[in-house]
Amino acid sequence: MSREITGKMPARKIRKIRKAAGLTQEEFARFLWVTYSTLNRWEAGRAVPFGLPLRILCLLERKLSSRPFQAVLQDPRASDPTFLLYRLLHSTFGRRQPKRL
């Protein structure tokens, strides 16, 4: 069962999530698969995220408070957006066991 993510994410919350992840705007934009100018508009409140970037932001917001994910953020590779996205998705979806037929 999937939960639909809708609504707006305030600019201050996006900035707070980025800073908690320890990423620059450029790194965070690559992490979310958007341009620097798009992220800049979100953080300035001139536009709002939707679709996949919004889903990733919501996942990251939830994971930031967990100890295991805090350890991921301390890893020197965490400034690499690909590494961070992989670890985020793996920590969210990677532990499920496949259903037996």
Regions found by a protein language model. Name each.
Residues 46-59:
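Short, basic-rich loop-to-helix N-cap that marks the start of a DNA-contacting helix
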Residues 10-13, 20, 36, 82, ...:
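Coiled-coil-like amphipathic alpha-helices with heptad-repeat character
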Residues 3, 66-101:
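Short, charged recognition helix plus adjacent turn
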